[in-house]
Curated annotation (Swiss-Prot):
It is found in: Secreted. Keywords: Cytokine, Disulfide bond, Glycoprotein, Growth factor, Secreted, Signal. Homodimer; disulfide-linked. Interacts with IL5RA. Interacts with CSF2RB. This is Interleukin-5. Glycans are attached at residues 76, 90. The gene is IL5. Pfam families: IL5. It comes from the Eukaryota. GO terms for cellular component: extracellular space. Residues 1-19 form the signal peptide. Homodimeric cytokine expressed predominantly by T-lymphocytes and NK cells that plays an important role in the survival, differentiation, and chemotaxis of eosinophils. Also acts on activated and resting B-cells to induce immunoglobulin production, growth, and differentiation. Mechanistically, exerts its biological effects through a receptor composed of IL5RA subunit and the cytokine receptor common subunit beta/CSF2RB. It comes from Equus caballus (Horse). Belongs to the IL-5 family. GO terms for molecular function: cytokine activity; growth factor activity; interleukin-5 receptor binding.
Length: 134
């Protein structure tokens, strides 16, 4: 019986480690996009004269629309070819994913307790994951 318990715990631990090792498709897409961005940076900069509004705020979650407007500007001003096509395709897929996630923001009406639980979690995220500027 004791041996069975040890084997069960060992199997559970192995399953947990395997689950951590598996990346989500979005994480892989973002990693690939970062690599493409680094690879094609010089091509994207071009002659350096293009001016794109860039958010000053460091909390990128608050500036998603501005970031994607900048991406559209960059895409429209960059010579399209095989070199950057995959980059802009990936950025479009990431935007689509974010748009789908934003649709989850409009939720149902909940009792005050559930809202306060959500608010507490929200403030915890701000406190731990956002860069608070002075």
């Amino acid at each position: 019986m004791r041996m069975l318990l040890h084997l069960s715990v060992l199997a559970l631990g192995a399953a947990y480690v395997c689950a951590l090792a598996v990346e989500s498709p979005m994480n892989r897409l973002v990693a690939e996009t970062l690599t493409l961005l680094s690879t094609h940076r010089t091509l994207l900069i071009g002659d350096g004269n293009l001016m794109i509004p860039t958010p000053e705020h460091k909390n990128h979650q608050l500036c998603i629309e501005e970031v994607f407007q900048g991406i559209d500007t960059l895409k429209n001003q960059t010579v399209q070819g095989d070199a950057v096509a995959k980059l802009f395709q990936n950025l479009s897929l990431i935007k689509g994913y974010i748009d789908l996630q934003k649709k989850k923001c409009g939720g149902e009406r909940w009792r005050v307790k559930q809202f306060l639980d959500y608010l507490q979690e929200f403030l915890g995220v701000i406190n731990t994951e956002w860069t608070i500027e002075g």
